[in-house]
C-alpha cells in the first residue's frame, strides 16, 4: 500500500460512512479531527477489527479526538435522493457538526461531497489515513448499535446479525414478513417484497 502523504495543514478531518449496502436503516457517517499530542494506537479500517477492539477504540477516539461528529441520512432520504447523494449529504452533516472547523477534509473513497473547505478523496483511506480509520470506527459502532436496537423491536428479521445487509436470511424474512417502516423502499429486494416490481 502506498504511504499516504498528508496535506500541509494542521486541522485535518477524516470522514467515512457505514451502511450504503444495507436494505434497512440510515447511512451513518463520522468526521474526526485527531489530536497529534494524544495518539491512538491500533487505528485501522473498522471492518478489519474485532467488535471488542472497535468498542474499545470507539471510546478512546471520543475521549482523545480534538473534535468528532456523526452525520446520517435516514432511509426515507435515501429513497428520495438515492444512496450516493444521501451519503454525500450525511458526510456534509458530519463535517458541519464538528465544533472545530477543519482546514482540510480527507474522505474515504473516490468522491467528495461539496464542502466549504478543501477536501480530497482517498481510495482505501480507512486503511491508510488515521483520521478516516477513526471515522470508520465511530460510524460502524454507531450503526451496529442502531441495528441491535432495531433487532429488539423486530426480532424476526435478525438485524443484529446481518446489520440490514441483503443476506439470504434477511431476504427470506423480508419475503415472509414484508418490509418495516425502516426499510429502504428504493432498493430492489424491498420493492419486490412490497410487490412494487415483479
Swiss-Prot record:
It comes from the Bacteria. Its cofactor is Mn(2+); Mg(2+). It is an enzyme of class 3 (hydrolase). Manganese or magnesium. Binds 1 divalent metal ion per monomer in the absence of substrate. May bind a second metal ion after substrate binding. It catalyses: Endonucleolytic cleavage to 5'-phosphomonoester. Residues 10-198 form the RNase H type-2 domain. Its EC number is 3.1.26.4. Keywords: Cytoplasm, Endonuclease, Hydrolase, Manganese, Metal-binding, Nuclease. This is Ribonuclease HII. GO terms for cellular component: cytoplasm; ribonuclease H2 complex. It comes from Salmonella paratyphi B (strain ATCC BAA-1250 / SPB7). NCBIfam families: PRK00015.1-1, PRK00015.1-3, PRK00015.1-4. It is found in: Cytoplasm.
